[in-house]
Amino acid sequence: MKQLIFCLLLFSATAASAELPSATTSMVKQTLASGKPTVIDLGARTCIPCKKMAPILEGLTREYQGRANVLFIDVREDSAAGDRFKVRMIPTQIFFNAQGKEVNRHIGFMDKTGLIKELKAAGVK
């Protein structure tokens, strides 16, 4: 039984480390200047809806590699980002077109279908 608990703890620690890293200010600036549509998810690793979105965002990062950017910012680690993007609740997803202009914003959990719809509206082909 102890081995099973240890394995489960080890697996959960490994799964947690697979999450998207929290983007820095310089990463955000670089990404928005990349010429690709971008979604930035502002949340926290401790927020339940944010945790549910993490695997969706990771999947979109792989699925849209080279066509769109997917970033995550933990506003509990980087509260200045929450202020800079005027986040009132988490999670908040902000969509930017290829020119780096904000084109839409959503507050709350967003499923994969909704994220893809908004990325396409932002210009992803």
List the predicted regions and their residue ranges.
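A short beta-strand-turn-helix
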Residues: 20-37
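Typically the conserved alpha-helix immediately C-terminal to a functionally engaged Cys/Sec
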Residues: 51-63
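Sec-dependent N-terminal signal peptides
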Residues: 4-12
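Thiol-based oxidoreductase modules, predominantly thioredoxin-like and allied folds used
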Residues: 61, 66-79
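Short pre-active-site segment immediately N-terminal to redox-active cysteine/selenocysteine motifs
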Residues: 35-38, 42-46, 89
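Non-catalytic, surface beta->alpha helical segment in thiol-disulfide oxidoreductase systems
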Residues: 98-125
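Structural micro-motif
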Residues: 86-94
